[in-house]
Amino acid sequence: MRNLSTLVGGTAAALTLAAAISCGGDDSNNSTGPSGSCTPSTNPATLVIQNNAICPQSITIARGGQLTIINQDSRSHDMTSDPHPSHTDCPELNQIGFLNSNQQRQSGNLTTARSCGMHDHSDPDRSTLKATITIQ
């Protein structure tokens, strides 16, 4: 009986460890994006949408630059500036707007130093689809 309980306990521990790893239990290399949900672009002025998540969720862009968003998700997204529903923080971000799956678009030139939030207008409360853009 003791061997059976040891086997069951060991199996449960192994399953727990496997679940933690497969759910992105180690997010040490991706502190600004949702763990295991999205792979950031190698372009520093680009956000990527995958699996209902945007990453990274925090990005810094030089004044005068533009933000690019690539929608690699299976559904469309309507990316706009905060706050919802007025979208007035950074109107330049509103030029990105509606993105079909596998579509990308750029913002207007971000010329004013500030910090702006953005979100998916169609799903404004989903935290994994919110990002902060810092313009320096």
Identify the meaning behind each predicted range:
Residues Q57-R75, T80, Q104-T112, C116:
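Beta-strand cores of secreted/periplasmic/IMS beta-sandwich domains, seen most often
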Residues S28-N29, G97-Q136:
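Extracellular/periplasmic metallocenter environments
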Residues T39-Q66:
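N-terminal edge beta-strand
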Residues Q72-R75, P83-H87, P124-D125:
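Acidic glycine-/aspartate-rich tracts in secreted/extracellular proteins
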Residues M1-S22:
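Sec-dependent bacterial lipoprotein signal peptides
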Residues T16-N43:
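Bacterial Sec-dependent N-terminal signal peptides
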